[in-house]
Structure formats: structure tokens, C-alpha cells
């Protein structure tokens, strides 16, 4: 998946 704003 896309790791855009993963904290």
C-alpha cells in the first residue's frame, strides 16, 4: 500500500 502519512 501507499505510505503517505503513516505515523
Curated annotation (Swiss-Prot):
Spans traversing the lipid bilayer? none
Listed A to Z, the keywords are: Amidation, Neuropeptide, Secreted
Q: Tell me one GO biological process term.
A: neuropeptide signaling pathway
The entry's cellular-component GO terms read: extracellular region
Q: Positions modified as Phenylalanine amide?
A: 7
Q: Record keywords: Secreted included?
A: yes
- Location in the cell: Secreted
Expression sites (tissue/organ): In larvae, expressed in the CNS and thoracic perisymapthetic organs (tPSO) but not in the ring gland or abdominal perisymapthetic organs (aPSO) (at protein level). In adults, expressed in brain and thoracic-abdominal ganglion but not in corpora cardiaca and corpora allata (at protein level).
Major localisation:
secreted
Superkingdom of origin? Eukaryota
Q: Does the keyword Transferase apply?
A: no
**Family to which this protein belongs:** Belongs to the FARP (FMRFamide related peptide) family.
Q: So what does this one do?
A: FMRFamides and FMRFamide-like peptides are neuropeptides.
Name of the featured protein:
FMRFamide-like neuropeptide PDNFMRF-amide
Q: Which organism is it from?
A: Delia radicum
